Swiss-Prot record:
Name listed for the protein in its UniProt record: Large ribosomal subunit protein uL3
Native organism taxonomy: Bacteria, Pseudomonadati, Pseudomonadota, Gammaproteobacteria, Aeromonadales
Positions where N5-methylglutamine occurs in the chain: 153
Record family assignment: Belongs to the universal ribosomal protein uL3 family.
Assembly and oligomerization: Part of the 50S ribosomal subunit. Forms a cluster with proteins L14 and L19.
Length: 212
C-alpha cells in the first residue's frame, strides 16, 4: 500500500508494555483526510490521490484554491498533499470521501516525512559533525574552523557539495521504518515509536514503510 495520511505532530510521551517496558512515542493527530482530486493515467499521465485536512478560512484562500475546493465540494483545508497509487489501488476512492487513521490498523511500520526544525546559520561542527581542532598546542582561534576546503591551482576551485558552514534544518526529512505502537481510532491518534522530523504542531506525512 502506497496510500498514506497527513497528520499533525502533537509531541512526545511514553507508553508502557505489559512487561513494564517504557517505549518513547511521538503522538500524531490524524484528522480525516478529504479527497479533493483523483488523478488518472489518461488525464494526468500518472495515478494519484490528492487530499486535504484541517480547515482554512475562506478569506485566506486564493481564487485558484477556492475554485479547486468548490469544484470538489470539499471544505477548504490547510494544504494539499498527493499520494501516488499503484495499479488497482484506490479503486474505491471518490472525490469527497474521507481517509481515516484506521487504514493503518494492520500496518506495523511507517515512514514519516516532515520539515525539520530550522537551526539558522550553523558551522561545520554542528552542521556536519566535524571534529574540533586542538584547543591548545599553538592553535590560535582556529578551533571550530573546517580546515582546508580544496587542493591547489589544479583544480583551482571548491568542488560542489563540499561540506561547509551554512543554513541548517528547515528541510524535508523522511525517517524510515518506525514502529507503529498504537492506532487510536476513537481519538484519531497514531503513536509511533521514537522521534519524527519537525516541530510540535507541524504537518507530517505518514506512509506504510517501503522497507518493512
Amino acid at each position: 500500500m502506497t496510500l498514506g495520511l497527513v497528520g499533525r505532530k502533537l509531541g512526545m510521551t511514553r507508553v508502557f508494555t505489559e512487561d513494564g517496558v517504557s517505549i518513547p512515542v511521538t503522538v500524531i493527530e490524524v484528522e480525516a483526510n478529504r479527497v479533493t482530486q483523483l488523478k488518472t493515467l489518461e488525464t494526468d499521465g500518472y495515478t494519484a490521490v490528492q487530499v486535504t485536512t484541517g480547515v482554512k478560512k475562506a478569506s485566506r484562500l486564493t481564487k485558484a484554491e477556492a475554485g479547486h475546493f468548490a469544484k470538489a465540494e470539499v471544505e477548504a483545508g490547510r494544504g494539499l498533499w498527493e499520494f501516488r497509487l499503484n495499479d488497482g489501488e484506490g479503486a474505491d476512492l471518490t472525490v469527497g470521501s474521507e481517509l481515516k487513521v484506521d487504514i493503518f490498523a494492520d500496518v506495523k511500520k511507517a515512514d514519516v516525512t516532515g520539515i525539520s526544525k530550522g537551526k539558522g546559520f550553523a558551522g561545520v561542527v554542528k552542521r556536519w559533525n566535524f571534529r574540533t581542532q586542538d584547543m591548545t598546542h599553538g592553535n590560535s582561534r582556529s578551533h571550530r574552523v573546517p580546515g582546508s576546503i580544496g587542493q591547489n591551482q589544479s583544480p583551482g576551485k571548491v568542488f560542489k557539495g563540499k561540506k561547509m558552514a551554512g543554513h541548517l534544518g528547515c528541510e524535508r526529512v523522511t525517517v524510515q521504518s518506525l514502529d507503529i505502537v498504537r492506532v487510536d481510532v476513537e481519538r484519531n491518534l497514531l503513536l509511533i515509536k521514537g522521534a519524527v522530523p519537525g516541530a510540535t504542531n507541524g504537518d507530517v506525512i505518514v506512509k506504510p514503510a517501503v522497507k518493512a
